[in-house]
A protein has these predicted regions:
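Divalent metal-coordination and catalytic microenvironments
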Residues: 11, 31, 51, 62, ...
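C-terminal cap of metal-dependent C-N hydrolases
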Residues: 426, 430-437, 442, 456, ...
């Protein structure tokens, strides 16, 4: 009879603490780690990890699986990249609390902010909840491969408490604030991980309006976070408005942390050019933590960007007036139309019409690059559309247009919007090296047609550990950032560590085989919707609560994932 449920043999362990690597076995029983060292007893199942690294499961603190966690059992791409815990409800958008009459409004917000087609949400969600605790119960009742936790999102909370006034962004009254504070406390007591909001000006609804939380008074955020203080738990997650300035917006963090006593986490990035204001923000974070508060910045390890292409939500010609004539054609007919000299002349000369802010970002020729297989997320500046045009003596539009024709419309572009200061990863590396910064902003479950960044864990290991082209982290440090450090930032202090008694969330990774593949379009959403997915190779095994959910980069069908209720 086997003494253990599972034994991982002879791996090199990076235990998530950032400490020394250890060559040892790991024994697992009952979903927990029972031994680390030389394990004598046999396992019911065994994994030979010789020559491989063994890590804790990774913790992705910024996802939007609020819908996908209900309509799907696999939280991919995240679970394809070693993530075993995903935090959803970020940016203050989600589906609860919500009265029946407000379903369409929340769909409109989610479609605009997170690029999830409306029909996917209307067809894919049962909407069999009203309150946030009821929503958590629905999530808890489902089956999935990895664990999830959820923030209480500000937009639906505001509309639920204020009705049409909340959607119209009217100031909250004292009664409104008291109601939202009470609902926040109730959400924390039911198992919410915290409260989330967005102040970002380019977060728009599908019809182009501002989301309910845009420009909400800081006093409103203090009141709601008072509900977390009342409950004695919860993390405040916020997307600050980068267009106002991270340093100017940081007062939101300072005031909420001071008034509520709750920790905060937020997204931080560098611009590609201009003054490095992010360094000033790092100083502010240090000040917050030195004074007894806690603030953590989430950093994307590669350029924050969009993926553009004819079959996706954005591409360099989508808002040209003539594009409307062929927008609804199949891609082969679009390409045939683009080969016509008249259409070519029109699309190369026309200016963009007004539209969602994301569309214009695919026309920043200085930071628009080809994305091929294997994908290069840190390309040289001369590979940009502007750089290639300068070398060839033509316009950037022509370079982009010809790429689309040469690839029969299948060619992809990377629009690097930030974290690529002066065309290098230096700023991302420096921010990630900071004691109060963690990797984040994977956005899994959202931006289905424009972003596929949930693969950042694989990228960090590949780019900063294996390649280390000028910007390096050692393996133990990188694993620490992806696991325990990330978990602690949102109050999940017991996760992301390989130690006896810990939950058995584990990766076995073949670093020699580790590769990140070009994003691809899959059509597996409700109502036949499509999304971007990105695969990796090199994950020999991913384990959740002692069950192997993925083996050699393929799902095993195991569904041990659960809802995490509270920190």
């Amino acid at each position: 009879m086997s003494e253990h449920d599972l034994v991982i043999r002879s791996g090199t362990i990076a235990d998530g603490s950032g400490g020394e690597l250890l060559d040892a076995d790991i024994a697992i029983s009952g979903g927990r780690i029972t031994a680390i060292g030389k394990v004598a007893g046999k396992g019911r199942e065994e994994i030979d990890a010789s020559g491989k690294i063994v890590t804790p499961g990774f913790v992705d603190v910024h996802t939007h699986y609020d819908g996908q966690s209900i309509w799907a059992e696999e939280l991919s791409p995240s679970s394809s990249h070693g993530v075993t815990t995903a935090i959803m409800g970020n940016c203050g958008v989600g589906f609860a609390p919500c009265r029946k009459g407000d379903h369409d409004m929340l769909i409109n917000v989610m479609e605009g902010v997170e690029d999830i087609p409306g029909v996917v949400m209307s067809d894919g969600l049962p909407w069999n909840w009203e309150t946030f605790p009821e929503y958590l119960d629905v999530v808890a009742s489902g089956k999935r491969d990895i664990d999830v936790a959820a923030y209480l999102p500000h937009s639906p909370l505001r509309v639920y408490a204020m009705g049409a006034r909340g959607a119209a962004r009217e100031p909250a009254t004292a009664d409104d604030l008291a109601t939202m504070r009470k609902l926040c406390r109730e959400a924390m007591e039911a198992g919410a991980l915290g409260f989330a909001t967005s102040r970002l000006s380019i977060h728009k609804t599908a019809d182009g309006g501002s989301i309910p939380t845009f420009e909400a008074d800081i006093a409103e955020l203090e009141a709601i976070c008072g509900g977390m203080a009342d409950a004695g738990t919860g993390t405040f997650q916020v997307v600050l408005d980068a267009f106002v300035g991270w340093d100017k917006e940081y007062q939101v963090i300072e005031r909420v942390v001071e008034s509520s006593g709750r920790p905060a986490t937020f997204t931080l990035a560098s611009g590609n050019d201009g003054p490095p204001r992010w360094r000033r923000v790092l100083e502010m974070i240090d000040r917050t933590n030195a004074s007894g508060g806690k603030a953590t910045a989430q950093i994307m390890p590669r350029p924050i960007g969009l993926i553009a292409g004819l079959e996706l939500t954005v591409h360099p010609f989508i808002l040209c007036p003539s594009w409307a004539k062929i927008a609804k054609l199949p891609i082969d007919q679009q390409v045939a139309a683009m080969r016509d000299p008249g259409m070519r002349e029109a699309l190369l000369s026309e200016e963009f019409e007004p539209g969602h802010p994301f569309n214009a970002l695919a026309r920043d020729w200085n930071w628009l690059f080809p994305l091929d297989n294997p994908p290069d997320y840190a390309p040289p500046k001369e590979m940009s559309m502007a750089g290639q045009a300068a070398a060839k003596g033509c316009t950037p539009q022509e370079i982009a247009y010809d790429r689309l024709l040469e690839t029969d419309g299948k060619g992809l572009f990377l629009a690097a919007l930030g974290n690529y200061e002066n065309g290098t990863l230096a700023s991302a590396h420096e921010m990630l090296s900071h004691p109060h910064c963690i990797p984040g902003l994977g956005d899994g479950g959202a931006h289905y047609g424009a972003i596929c960044d949930a693969s950042y864990s694989t990228y960090l290991l590949k780019q900063y550990v294996q390649k280390a082209n000028g910007y390096r982290f050692d393996l133990a440090e990188a694993v620490h950032m992806l696991s325990h450090k990330a978990a602690c930032a949102v109050g999940l202090n017991g996760r992301g560590l390989l130690q006896v008694g810990a939950k058995a969330d584990i990766n076995v990774i073949d670093m020699d085989r580790l590769e990140l593949h070009l994003p691809e379009i899959v059509r597996d959403l409700p109502a036949g919707g499509q999304r971007l997915h990105q695969r990796a190779t090199g994950y020999d095994a991913t384990i959740v609560s002692g069950e192997i959910i993925r083996r050699f980069d393929q799902s095993t069908g195991a569904r041990p994932g659960q809802l995490i209720r509270g920190a």
